[in-house]
């Protein structure tokens, strides 16, 4: 995976929510662009979402690259919200990338920027613990302050 000359540590961490039912899907999302087509905005995460999405349908390939993909759907409402890169192709691995293989369509999810421990500053990816994804629904609740932002 090529992250040389690429830095993502200054990117904001987002809580990702399903646009259809408002379910929190991940607490460590990042705004990103599709490697094969940088005009396409999306969100991504590095840790598999727990108890919020599941695979749906069969694996597929796109005409843009040779990555093997599989759609993921929100467990609460059933809508397709993104896809998982099951097997990344060498072209994408050699491109400047953030190492994330869980992708969320910007038409299906929205992001809420997270605040750091002080509650004042935005939480940046470089300050995020490596294994933070939680499964406890109470900790995934979005505070009123974050909704207002």
UniProtKB/Swiss-Prot annotation:
Cysteines joined through disulfide linkages = none
Lineage: superkingdom: Eukaryota
For this UniProt entry, which segments traverse the membrane? none
Keywords assigned: Cytoplasm, Mitochondrion
Recorded hits in Pfam families, A to Z, give: YPEH2ZP
**Where expressed (tissue)?**
Expressed at high levels in stomach and also in kidney and, at low levels, in heart (at protein level). In the stomach, highly expressed in foveolar cells, parietal cells and chief cells (at protein level). In kidney, expressed in endothelial cells, mesangial and epithelial cells (parietal and visceral epithelium) around glomerulus (at protein level).
Q: Which GO terms describe its cellular component?
A: cytosol; membrane; mitochondrion
Keyword Cytoplasm attributed: yes
| Compartment(s) of residence | Cytoplasm; Mitochondrion
Please name the InterPro entries in this protein's record.
Answer: YPEH2ZP (IPR026768)
Q: What's a BP term from Gene Ontology annotated to this protein?
A: positive regulation of apoptotic process
Protein task: May play a role in the regulation of cellular reactive oxygen species metabolism. May participate in cell growth regulation.
The entry assigns this protein to a family as follows: Belongs to the FAM72 family.
Subunit? Interacts with UNG.
Q: What is the protein's name according to its record?
A: Protein FAM72A
- The organism is Mus musculus
